[in-house]
Design a protein with these regions (language model features):
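Conserved ABC transporter NBD signature motif
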Residues: 55-69
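Conserved ABC ATPase signature
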Residues: 123-130
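Conserved small/polar residues in nucleotide/adenosyl-binding loops
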Residues: 228-230
Length: 230
């Protein structure tokens, strides 16, 4: 579903991503794990088409900046992406119109799951940051994307929302979506990942699969800590 080939990104003369290649298949959860400043958010913004880069990125076989690719993609950034003067309900209606999809009640069910149903008439500017983040998640999922990218998804969420989000990860995987989750919090990715790419200084320092033989030899936490302290 998602393929990156030799993606490199500079900010001026500063190298942010160095020759990154990987793929995320349908029904797979991939993790980008690394300390702050490792280049995780930069590579995600490249995938989402927000930054220019060298190399090649495709989504469902389409170039990542094409309309076809964008219809398959959901990008939920670390900083909530909401409009101050739209209500919660109007946010979902805006997304439905943008993607030309009918209201089948899925958006309302997402609001119920994330405890926003009673806030449907509140403006975006009147929501707490945690509520804005939950709304951003609902908006990202309402068009049923095939590739879902989360950047630090647990930040600002309450315990109930974190539980629901983890359940949602598993549900989306079971339904065949590809998920890419960026985080620096190793405990937030336990139990549900298929492959983890550890980023250090803009490049992949290691890749570990969620297989008993690999985890028996060395836990993900031990591998991560050994690499970031080099």
């Amino acid at each position: 579903m998602l393929t990156l080939n030799h993606v490199t990104k500079y900010y001026g003369k500063n190298l942010a991503n160095d020759d990154i290649s990987f793929q995320v298949d349908s029904g797979q959860i991939a993790i980008l794990l690394g300390p702050n400043g490792a280049g995780k958010s930069t590579i995600i913004k490249c995938i989402a088409g927000l930054l220019r880069f060298q190399g090649d990125i495709t989504i469902g076989g389409h170039g990542n900046k094409t309309t076809e690719a964008k219809r398959l993609l959901a990008y939920i950034p670390e900083t909530p992406a909401v409009y101050d003067m739209l209500t919660v309900s109007e946010h979902l209606e805006f997304i439905r119109r943008a993607y030309r999809i009918e209201d089948d009640g899925y958006g309302e069910r997402l609001l119920e799951r994330f405890e926003l149903a009673d806030k449907r008439d509140k403006l975006g500017r009147d929501l707490s940051k945690g509520m804005q983040q939950k709304l951003s998640i609902c908006c990202g999922l309402v068009h049923r994307p095939k590739l879902i990218i989360f950047d630090e998804p647990m930040v600002g969420l309450d315990p109930h929302a974190i539980k629901e989000l983890k359940l949602l990860f598993r549900e989306q995987k079971a339904q065949g979506a590809a998920l890419l989750i960026s985080t620096h919090m190793i405990d937030s990715v336990e139990d549900y990942w298929d492959v983890t790419h550890i980023m250090v200084n803009g490049r992949f320092a290691a890749t570990q699969y969620n297989r008993p033989e690999e985890l028996k030899a060395r836990s993900l936490e031990d591998l991560f800590l050994s690499l970031i302290h080099i």
